[in-house]
Design a protein with these regions (language model features):
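Phosphate- and other anionic-substrate recognition elements at nucleic-acid/protein interfaces
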Residues: 1-180
Length: 180
């Protein structure tokens, strides 16, 4: 089956890796903190090489950057430039080490798939994603891991639509609300 590496990319990055059809991905968090942009990019490059050099997945999926107007007055140009640089580092390394498909997915589509809601307020959406992960038995430690697991689930569902049934209360009894 197809193996996916899903990445919620930022200076603190969440990742999830697994095959389509797996019960759960392997997931974690990595920090690329550094004294300057160059050190941040070097740490990201080293991490990605370790993730793909010996056994590259068939697909790497990265959460898309938001359009500049979405973050107007909420972030600095330096932060946006860093995120764009991280995207370049991850994409270049993945291609160099033989990953066949490198793609992006929008946060709205991922959240709609994983929680049923596309336009929740950011903090509520992150909490809903973590709650869904825990309901699935994926013991994520933070929202970075949760978002990466949601990206992995979304991507697996695009390859095999039956995978989408796992995150739907209609088809997964463990996710149903019982206290009405």
């Amino acid at each position: 089956m197809t193996e996916i590496l899903a990445i919620d990319l930022a200076t603190t990055t969440g990742y999830a890796r697994g095959r389509v059809g797996d019960d759960a991905p392997m997931f974690g968090t990595v920090s690329f903190q550094g004294k300057d942009q160059n050190q941040v990019f070097a740490k990201a490059l080293q991490w990605m090489m370790e993730m793909v050099r010996e056994s590259p997945p068939q697909i790497v999926v990265i959460e898309s950057m938001l359009p500049p107007q979405a973050m107007l007055n909420k972030t600095s140009r330096q932060v946006r430039d860093r995120l764009a640089g991280l995207h370049g580092v991850i994409r270049g390394c993945a291609r160099r080490w033989g990953v066949g498909e490198i793609s992006e997915c929008g946060v709205g589509e991922v959240r709609k798939h994983f929680t049923g809601f596309r336009n929740m307020q950011r903090d509520n959406a992150k909490r809903a994603v973590m709650d869904q992960c825990k309901a699935l038995g994926w013991n994520v430690r933070n929202d970075n891991e949760g978002d990466a697991c949601a990206i992995w689930s979304y991507s697996a569902s695009l390859i095999d639509p039956k995978q989408a049934l796992r995150v739907s209360p209609l088809f997964n009894k463990g996710l149903r609300v019982t206290g009405w």
